[in-house]
Amino acid sequence: MQPRTPLVLCVLLSQVLLLTSAEDLDCTPGFQQKVFHINQPAEFIEDQSILNLTFSDCKGNDKLRYEVSSPYFKVNSDGGLVALRNITAVGKTLFVHARTPHAEDMAELVIVGGKDIQGSLQDIFKFARTSPVPRQKRSIVVSPILIPENQRQPFPRDVGKVVDSDRPERSKFRLTGKGVDQEPKGIFRINENTGSVSVTRTLDREVIAVYQLFVETTDVNGKTLEGPVPLEVIVIDQNDNRPIFREGPYIGHVMEGSPTGTTVMRMTAFDADDPATDNALLRYNIRQQTPDKPSPNMFYIDPEKGDIVTVVSPALLDRETLENPKYELIIEAQDMAGLDVGLTGTATATIMIDDKNDHSPKFTKKEFQATVEEGAVGVIVNLTVEDKDDPTTGAWRAAYTIINGNPGQSFEIHTNPQTNEGMLSVVKPLDYEISAFHTLLIKVENEDPLVPDVSYGPSSTATVHITVLDVNEGPVFYPDPMMVTRQEDLSVGSVLLTVNATDPDSLQHQTIRYSVYKDPAGWLNINPINGTVDTTAVLDRESPFVDNSVYTALFLAIDSGNPPATGTGTLLITLEDVNDNAPFIYPTVAEVCDDAKNLSVVILGASDKDLHPNTDPFKFEIHKQAVPDKVWKISKINNTHALVSLLQNLNKANYNLPIMVTDSGKPPMTNITDLRVQVCSCRNSKVDCNAAGALRFSLPSVLLLSLFSLACL
C-alpha cells in the first residue's frame, strides 16, 4: 500500500460517514458505522493507520475512551485505529468499545480476504450497517447493541438508544424478550420516555451470546402503537476462558523402532471463548518431557493440530535400552494464537513405547535334571528361560514343546504365567521296572512371532534327564474285577474261586498274603496263603445286600515289603435264583353286604420274591377242608389275580376264608393265608358292620382297592 493511501482512505471514509449520518437530522449517540470489513494485508505495520472510527455521544465526546479487543491495536483520541507492532495475523474479528459519561457503543471490524490487496478503495473498505438493511419505512429506528462481557460496576449503564421520530406525544417505549420479561429477567430495561436502553448487571457471553429483544411504542393505556421491532444485543467476547483438555486421560502408544515422524496421538483442547476471535485460537507446545533420556526432545507436537510425533531415530526408540518405556509430556494449549498474553491450560500425555518381539527366549542352561518316584504324577522340574522383551506381552510369554523322548505321552509341559518357567509334569505314572531313565528334548518359543531379522537359536532348546526311583508297589489282582456265577442255595463251605495277585516289584521277590476287606453279608472266607475263597453261609439272592442279583465283596493282597504295600481286588458274584420263596396274597381283609345283589367279594393278587419262572402264573384255591363248597367261589382273572365271590347271601358276621396260592416253580411252593370277610348290614346307603365286629368298608370300596392293587402290578 502506498504511503498516501491511508490518508486517502480516511478522507473517503469520512465523506461516506458524513453522508450516512445525514440521513437523520437528529443526533444518535454511538458509532456512526457499526461494522467494517477490512481486507487482510500481508502485514499490519507498527503505528500504521488502518482506518478512522467516528463516535459521538451528541454532547461533545467529553472524556472519550476507546478499548480494542486485541492487545496489538489501539484507537487514538481522534478515532484512528493503528497497530502497536508488526503482526501478520489477528484472527477474524476485532471489536472497538467507545465510552463517555453520556454514551457508549461497540464497533465490529471483520478481517477478510488474503494478503494481496487489489481493487478500488471502496473494495478495500466495505461499509455496512448491520441493521436496518435495507432501510425500512418505519418510525422506530434501532441498531444492534454490542456490549462487552464482564463489565464492572456501576450498573445500570446505558448501552444504546431507540429513536422514534414520529412518536406521538405521551407515547411510551416498551422492551420485551429474553432478558427483560423472560428468564433471565431484568437484565435489560428501557427508559419509556427517552428510549435509552441500559444493562443492569455483568454479562457472560459463554452463557448467552446474543439476546433477541423487541421494541414497541404504546399509548398511555399500554396499547401497541408501533412494533414490535427486533433489537439484537450482542455480547462481545473477552478472553476470560482458559483452554481445557476435556477428553483425558491421554494415553498413546508407539512401537519401538518406529521411523522418525511416526504419529503417536492427537491432543486437542477446548476454549469456551468466541471461536471467531483469537480468544479461542489455540496453539500447542510441549512444556516438559519426563524422563528426558536419551533425548530431551523425543517428541514434537504440531502447534495447530495437536498431533504428537516422534522426532528421534528408530535406534533411540529401543524399549530394551530405555530406562523407562513410559514417557509423560506436559502439553500446553495457549489461546490468542500462542501469544504471550494468551491464557493457557495444560494436560499430561502418557506415551508407552510398545514392545515388539525382537528377542528370542533362551534357556538358562542346556541341561536340566529331575527325579520322580514310579507311580507318581505331577510337576517334576521347572525349566527357566530369559527374555528381554516386555513381560506383559506375547513377545515375552513362552510356549514350550517336547520334541523328543515322549513316545508314550507320559510327560506334559505347561508355562507358568507368573514366572514364564516351563513346568514339566508326569501325567502317566512311570514304571521303574520298565524304564529307570528318560531323556527329553524341550523347545521354547514365544507366543508372538519373532520379527523378520531375529530367529530361534541353539539356546532355545534344552535337554531334561529324568531318573525314576523304585518304590514298593502294591500287589495287583488279575483280573479285576473277578466275576463268578453261582446258585443262591449253594451249600456252606463251597469254593467260589481262587484269587490271584502279582507283585509289580518283580526284582524284590516278595510274598503275598490275602484277607477279606469288605463282605457286607458275612458269607465269604479267603485262604491267606493261596487266595481260595469259599462260603461260610448260605447265599441268598433276596438278601438286602444283593443288588440286581449281584453280590460285591472286596479282598486285600498285602506284600512283605517294609513297609508293606497293599492292593485291592473286587469280586462280583452273580446269584442264580432258586424257588425258595412261597407266594403271598393281598389284600387279606374284605367286606360285603348281607343283602348284596352283586355277590363278588374281593379281587385277590399274588406276589413272589423269586424270579421268573419261579413266580407266576399263580394257582388260587379255597382250602376245601375248612370251608363248605356251596358258599364260596374263587375264579381266575389272569396269571396274578383271582376273584372271590359268594354263592349266596350270608348273615352279618366275620368269616375266615383260607386261600391257597401256588407258584410255578419246580418244585412249586404253596402258601395258605386266611382272607377275613366281614358281612355287614347295608340299609339306606349306610353300612353297619358293628354287629359283626367288622371294619367299616363297603363292598364297592373293597372292590375298588382290589382293582387299584391289580393296576399297580
Swiss-Prot record:
Q: Which Gene3D superfamilies did the record assign?
A: Cadherins (2.60.40.60)
Q: Which GO terms describe its molecular function?
A: adiponectin binding; beta-catenin binding; cadherin binding; calcium ion binding; identical protein binding; lipoprotein particle binding; low-density lipoprotein particle binding
InterPro entries, per the entry: Cadherin, Cadherin-like_dom, Cadherin-like_sf, Cadherin_CS, Cadherin_pro_dom
Stretch forming the signal peptide: 1-22
- The highest taxon in the source lineage is Eukaryota
Which tissues carry this protein? Highly expressed in heart. In the CNS, expressed in cerebral cortex, medulla, hippocampus, amygdala, thalamus and substantia nigra. No expression detected in cerebellum or spinal cord.
Which residues bear sugar attachments?
Answer: N52, N86, N382, N500, N530, N598, N638, N671
User: Where found, per UniProt?
Assistant: Cell membrane; Cytoplasm
Glycoprotein as a keyword of this entry, yes or no, is yes
SUPFAM superfamilies for the chain: Cadherin-like
Give GO cellular component annotations, separated by semicolons: adherens junction; catenin complex; caveola; collagen-containing extracellular matrix; cytoplasm; external side of plasma membrane; extracellular exosome; extracellular region
* Annotated effect of mutating E367Q: In a patient with amyotrophic lateral sclerosis
Instruction: Note the effect listed for G113R.
Output: In a patient with amyotrophic lateral sclerosis
Show where the Cadherin domain sits: 139-245, 246-363, 364-477, 478-585, 584-694
Record keywords, A-Z: Calcium, Cell adhesion, Cell membrane, Cleavage on pair of basic residues, Cytoplasm, Glycoprotein, GPI-anchor, Lipoprotein, Membrane, Metal-binding, Repeat, Signal
- Prosequence residues removed at maturation: 23-138, 694-713
Indicate where this protein is primarily found. membrane
> What's its membrane topology?
Lipid-anchor; GPI-anchor
Residues with lipid group (GPI-anchor amidated glycine): G693
**What biological process terms from GO does the record include?**
adherens junction organization; calcium-dependent cell-cell adhesion via plasma membrane cell adhesion molecules; cell migration; cell morphogenesis; cell-cell adhesion mediated by cadherin; cell-cell junction assembly; cellular response to toxic substance; cellular response to xenobiotic stimulus
Described purpose of this protein according to its UniProt entry:
Cadherins are calcium-dependent cell adhesion proteins. They preferentially interact with themselves in a homophilic manner in connecting cells; cadherins may thus contribute to the sorting of heterogeneous cell types. May act as a negative regulator of neural cell growth.
How does this polypeptide assemble, per the annotation? By contrast to classical cadherins, homodimerization in trans is not mediated by cadherin EC1 domain strand-swapping, but instead through a homophilic adhesive interface which joins two elongated EC1-EC2 domains through a region near their Ca2+-binding sites to form a tetrahedral, X-like shape.
Its domain comment says: Three calcium ions are usually bound at the interface of each cadherin domain and rigidify the connections, imparting a strong curvature to the full-length ectodomain.
Name this polypeptide is given: Cadherin-13
- Name of the coding gene: CDH13
